[in-house]
Design a protein with these regions (language model features):
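Long, low-complexity ectodomains and other extracytoplasmic segments of secretory-pathway proteins
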Residues: 1-11, 25-29, 37, 104-145
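Surface-exposed binding patches on compact interaction domains or structured appendages
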Residues: 8-85
Length: 145
């Protein structure tokens, strides 16, 4: 994904890039049901400068005074992450998270850019996932009162 980091101040600002990636987890009592809590992933990011005013050195982003820096970040799942998702969700599952820009100067604010993707075969995924609490009702074993 590509995004702009905009500096409206009269001095250069620097941020350290990091990330957090996650997917759904499954119920511990029945692994066929989504637990609606996050499962952290080990994937990594690769960042590159696309254009603009500033620099990108490793994970450090610096935006010149009154400048805009365009950055491209690619999030890549590890083989372990892919195996986990494949084992829990045969049709695939969402992968989501944040690209975090932590300001080096404590007077600046930290920034977060959300991302959302899908790993698997989108055309094979069911329209709805049953949660643990809905399973009995949807399977006809219980009735609404």
């Amino acid at each position: 994904m590509e995004f702009n980091v905009v500096n409206l101040s009269g001095t250069a600002v620097s941020y350290n890039l990091s990330h957090v990636g996650m997917t759904e987890s499954v119920s511990t009592s029945d692994p066929t049901h989504v637990a609606e809590t996050g499962q952290l992933l080990d994937g990594g990011i690769k960042a590159e400068k696309v254009g603009g005013n500033g620099s990108l050195n490793g994970s450090k982003v610096t935006v010149d005074a009154n400048g805009t820096l365009k950055v491209k970040v690619t999030y890549t799942l590890t083989n372990k992450d892919k195996s986990l998702i494949d084992s829990l969700f045969p049709y695939g599952m969402y992968v989501e998270g944040f690209i975090k820009l932590t300001a080096e100067n404590s007077e600046e604010i930290d920034l977060n850019v959300p991302f959302l993707a899908f790993f698997g075969d989108w055309t094979q995924a069911p329209m709805f996932d049953k949660t643990y609490y809905e399973a009995a009702v949807l399977d006809g074993a219980a009735k609404w009162q």
